[in-house]
Amino acid sequence: MNAYPVTDAVTYVGADDPDLALFEGQYPVRPIGVSYNSYVITDQKIAVMDTVDARVTEAWLENLDYALDGRTPDYLIISHMEPDHAANIARLAALYPEMKLVGNAKTFVMLRQFFGPDAAPADHLVTVGEGDVLELGSHRLRFFLAPMVHWPEVMVTYEESEKLLFSADAFGRFGALSLTEKAPWAPQARRYYLNIVGKYGAQVQALLKKLASLPVEAILPLHGPVLTQEIGRCLELYDLWSSYRPEEPDRVLVAYASIYGHTKQAALALADLLTERGADVTTCDLTTTHVSDALTQAFCCGKLVLASVTYDGGLFPPMEELLNHLKAKNFQNRKIGLMENGSWAPQAARLMRARLEEMKNLTLCPTAVSIRSALNEGSRQQLQQLADELLAP
């Protein structure tokens, strides 16, 4: 059991999933896993804040039983209907048939889709809208709709007396709490945000504006730790990420996709040139780095170099995968350099340029380095030109 008090009235009852390999079936989280968070607010009336993934049902029920201490919950607040948070709604409703479910209109559409038309009696559904308040006693829950952060039915809850923000998936982080207790929040929160929520920057900006006037003493997300320190910094990072601005505008990421090492050699030669000129440079081998990590690095940097071999007349799949993910997550506002390699018909630069032109507000350097099999004097001169263009103001 890992239930613990957040405040005198709020208890954490979530559960860790340290053995999960892929979050959402695609993002590697082993060996740190993930947490599925749920909370109980105890007052004259009791509210359970969300359920958990089916993988951790029994651990959650044990924690919940401890927190309730024989009492019956009056409300289940449903922040988000994604199954890693909503899988146990029907189970909890069956255990406590008098409990009411609190959500917005879109919540209950999805509730019926997941659990059937008779998921809950109509008189057990409490529909709330923007700014509505639910009184528990001395605790007052105010609801704010957060559509597409990152599903359409999402809402966040602000507890007014203790100034607590129950933030749904916003401000979440990868990592089971038992395994990442002392880990800094930002690295895995950044990777989580950019890969899970990153497409919806405008919607996150809208939510941040709604919350701007609220004093917040703690943020209680559905993944990762409860945030009680440096909340201002967490809000600043969310504002930065959701506005598609780089955290490190002058840093250059050189991401390369190489088969036999010649494209890698050229990419590292460019990285050396840039470093010699005082640039902060990071390199990324796309054949060994998961695309979620490469994407995270790309969003951090103000400048990106893409170096790819030509493959079957097209892009080498690791580079194509990165470009697909960058487009899907709304990558923008960066300076881009291109490098290609091909032994008889290099096509990668043209194809990468075409994909990048589908994205917003990207500045492509005029020089695209074109290599025939291996670096030679001519392509080394192109590297010099590209380095000049990348570092130009």
Question: Where does each model-flagged region fall?
Answer:
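Metallo-beta-lactamase
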Residues: 4-8, 103-154, 200-208
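FMN-binding flavodoxin-like domain, especially the glycine-rich phosphate-binding loop
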Residues: 177-219, 223-226, 269-282, 294-393
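Terminal amphipathic helices with adjacent charged low-complexity linkers/tails
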Residues: 223-249
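Structural motif
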Residues: 45-47, 75, 139, 163-166, ...
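Active-site metal-binding motif and surrounding structural segment of the metallo-beta-lactamase
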Residues: 44, 55-102
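Active-site neighborhood of phospho(di)ester-bond hydrolases with catalytic His/Asp-centered motifs
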Residues: 49-51, 73-81, 101-104, 165-168, ...
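Conserved beta-strand hairpin/beta-sheet module of binuclear metal-dependent hydrolase folds
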Residues: 3-65, 156-159, 163-167, 263
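Short, charged N-terminal beta->alpha structural module
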Residues: 255-277
